[in-house]
Structures are given as C-alpha cells and as structure tokens.
Amino acid sequence: MAKDERQAALDAALKKIEKNFGKGSIMRMGEKVDTQVSTVSSGSLALDEALGVGGYPRGRIVEIYGPESSGKTTVALHAVAEVQKQGGTAAYIDAENAMDPKYATALGVNIDDLLLSQPDTGEQGLEIADALVSSGAVDILVVDSVAALVPRAEIEGEMGDAHVGLQARLMSQALRKLSGTINKTKTIALFINQIREKVGVMFGNPEVTPGGRALKFYSTVRLEVRRAETIKNGTDMIGNRARIKVVKNKVAPPFKVAEVDIMYGQGISRTGELVDMAVEKDIINKSGSWYSYGSERIGQGRENAKNYLADHEDVEDEVRLKVRAAYGISDVPEEDLPTTEDEQINILPDDSTEE
C-alpha cells in the first residue's frame, strides 16, 4: 500500500471513530490543548516537591499506605483542606468509622462542606464513590480505607467462614469502572490502605497491601508513609517524624522521599518542613545548633527556629517564596492553570493481571 493510500485509510478510520464515539475520542497527542499535568497541592511543601509536579495530579488515582498510626489519614486530610481552600468540593468515604471532626477541623478541613459517608459494606462504599465521581462535581474523593471495604458476603456470613479473594475481586471490578470516570471528571481519588504480612516469607519483604493487586496497577502515585521517630519536648511526646516515600509515580521520577513533622492535634508542621528545605538550599544557614536567616539569628535548635517562623509570619512568607523558587515549585493557583474538558488520557493498568 502506497504512503498516500495508507494516510487516506488512517484518516477514514479516524473519522469513523470520531463519528461513532464522539469528538476527542482519538487524537494525536501533540494536538492536545493542554499537555501540562494539572495538580492540587498536597498541603505539604516537602511532599509537593517529592511528587515532582507540585502536588497530586487531577484525574488520577493515588494510594497512600503504611503501618498503623503512621500519618496516612493526616496526609489525606491535608489534601482535602487544600482542595476546599481553592473552592473545590471534597468527599470522604469513612469505611473505618474513625473520622475525628475536631482533628479534621484543626488541619483546616471545613467539616460543614465535607461530604461524609460511612457505608455498611464495601459494595455500598464503592457504589457511593462511583456516584460521586460520575457527578463531575467532586474535586477530591478519599476512601479510608481499602482494608475496611468488607464485601457484603463476608458481613452477612458467619465468623470463621472462608471468603477467598472476595475483596480483591471487588476492588478489581470497581477500579475497572472508576478509573475512566475519574480521568474524565478530573477527580483526585485518594485510597488509604493498610499493610499486612504474608505468613512464611523467608526472603524479601513480607508486607503486602489488602485488596489485591488492582489498586497497585491503576494508581498513578503510590505513597508509603512510615513513622521515623518520635518528637519530644523534654519528656513529653508531641509528635512524630514521618517519612513519605513516593514508591510509584507515572507523572514524575519516583522514589523521592519527603520527611515531615506530624504534630499531635495539629497535623503536618509547615514551619518544620520549611526549615529543613531552606537549610538544604542555604536560604537559612545552620552553624552548629544555631539557625540564622540573613544576618539575624532565628533560634538555637530546630524547634526554636520553627517557633521563630511561626511567630514571624512575614519572615515565614519570605522564606517560603524563596524555597518554592529554589525547588521550582509553581506558585500559580490551580484555578489559573489552563484546563480542557476534552482531555482524554486513559488510565491503563501496568499489567493485565488485576487480582
């Protein structure tokens, strides 16, 4: 077949596809109006930098997993607060029935506007998620957690009954249905997950996440949250140092790490991560135990430097702008970013194996 004939056949096929499935169902990638990944800040400057694109990508699935009390829910609630600050709508599916309104409020979440569901079964929770995403009016959806999405058959059965693979099949079916809708509606879907240990594993990592393999494949970003150390004020424990590792990233290089202070009752310490990032870029100078900004000493010890920035908002804002510029994190608000409703990027699993 000659080159002209091949091109004519291709053009005819493209016209037929657009006629059958609508304009925008197929296009050359260079013809897309916007190729920039649209994002929303995670609420943590250090995590935004680790994600590589300045936050969570819109229209994608994100998995946050880790041990108990490591800070997974805190990370998710900060993202909810950021979406609400920009005037967006947030929904929270609390399958664990453990939402603390007081703590959420302390993190900046407007609980009056937060859509909350506490489903009875896994099927119900995922149906609610599908309905919310399909509406196109929800900017971020949090499912807390995948491990708590118990299939109806297990709820209605007897204790001790074997239900092999039920949850994995449920998640696989749900994600096949949800992934395309999430992409088209530009919803950020955050799935919080726990970890389990395989019995009898002698070599390698015995830790696995519940719900089968489907979520691993469909996720654009996977974050591993672990508690690194305890933060103390004298003998009092006032928080945890959390290590957030980007173990999978389809929109930027993976394996970057963000370390943040999660203070009890307050969430992620913005001044703590700001001090660390500013020191790394020599915006704040550290000599011995003393921290100084310009010609002024701002504290002896990291905690005192954090307190200084918290007490001097003008200095904090100035340092934050310099840090964002040094790390190349955009200052453009989300609403000012170019968007397109016709953008069609399929979220395909990495592998055909889903369970």
From Swiss-Prot:
Gene Ontology biological process terms from the UniProt entry: DNA recombination; DNA repair; SOS response
SMART domains with a match to the protein in the record: AAA
Domain of life the protein comes from: Bacteria
GO terms under cellular component: cytosol
InterPro entries in UniProt: AAA+_ATPase, DNA_recomb/repair_RecA, DNA_recomb/repair_RecA_CS, P-loop_NTPase, RecA-like_C, RecA-like_N, RecA_ATP-bd, RecA_C_sf
Matches recorded under Pfam families: RecA, RecA_C
Entry keyword annotation includes Signal: no
Binding site for ATP: 66-73
Subcellular location: Cytoplasm
Principal subcellular localisation of the protein: cytoplasm
Positions with biased composition (Acidic residues): 332-344
Gene Ontology MF term list: ATP binding; ATP hydrolysis activity; ATP-dependent DNA damage sensor activity; damaged DNA binding; single-stranded DNA binding
Keywords: ATP-binding, Cytoplasm, DNA damage, DNA recombination, DNA repair, DNA-binding, Nucleotide-binding, SOS response
Disordered: region residues: 331-355
Family: Belongs to the RecA family.
Function: Can catalyze the hydrolysis of ATP in the presence of single-stranded DNA, the ATP-dependent uptake of single-stranded DNA by duplex DNA, and the ATP-dependent hybridization of homologous single-stranded DNAs. It interacts with LexA causing its activation and leading to its autocatalytic cleavage.
Name of the featured protein: Protein RecA
Gene that encodes it: recA
